[in-house]
Amino acid sequence: MQLFDLWTDLLDLLTIVAGPTAVGKGTVISHLRKCHPQVKVSISATTREPRDSERDGIDYYFVTDEVFDCMVRSGQMLEWATVHGLHKYGTPKEEVERLLHTGQPVILEIDLQGMRKVRKILPAVRTVILLPPAWDDLICRIKRRGSESQDEIDARLATAKKELEAIGEFDYKIVNADVEIAANELWLAMNRV
C-alpha cells in the first residue's frame, strides 16, 4: 500500500491554504492557531534566505539548492516548485505524514503550483484560496514588507495575477480584509465535510 493510500483515511484533516504573495496567509493561519491550537501547520523547505523574523525549523526549513535537489531526487517531497522564478519551495512528505498521524487538523500553506500537484495525488483534498480585498491592497502589503527588491516585487506580482486567475480551482475563497474574520472563515471551511 502506498503512502498516499494511507493518507486517504486522514484526508478530512488536511486543508491546503494558498493565495498570492503578501495576502496574509501566515498571519491568518497564526491567528487561527491562537484560537485553535490543535491545528498543525506543515513546515515547507525553501532555498531562499530567511527574513529577519523567520527561524529555521519553525517558519521554514532553509536549505541550500544542493540539499533541496537531493530531497527532490530521493522522493522526499510531496510537492515542490520554483516560485516567482527565484527560489525553490517544497513540502516534505515525512512532515505531512507525521502531522496527519496526530489526528489533528493539518494545514499546508503552499502556492498554486503546489496545490495542483497535491490535488493530482489527492483529488479530494480541501483547498482554500486567500484573496486580497483589492489588487492595490496587495501591492501596498508587499511594498510595506520592505524585504524584496523591485525586481522581486514585480516577479511576485506577476505570479499573483496568475494565482488570482485560478480562483475557480479552489473549493473555498476567503477575502482577507480582516484577519479575525478570515481566520474564522478558514476554520469553518476546514470543518466542512
UniProtKB/Swiss-Prot annotation:
Function: Essential for recycling GMP and indirectly, cGMP.
The organism of origin for this protein: Tropheryma whipplei (strain Twist) (Whipple's bacillus)
Organismal lineage: Bacteria, Bacillati, Actinomycetota, Actinomycetes, Micrococcales
Similarity comment: Belongs to the guanylate kinase family.
Keywords assigned by UniProt, alphabetized: ATP-binding, Cytoplasm, Kinase, Nucleotide-binding, Transferase
GO MF term (any one): guanylate kinase activity
Catalysed conversion reaction: GMP + ATP = GDP + ADP
Protein name listed in UniProt: Guanylate kinase
Presence of keyword Transferase: yes
Gene: gmk
Disulfide pairings: none
One cellular component term from this protein's GO annotations in UniProt: cytosol
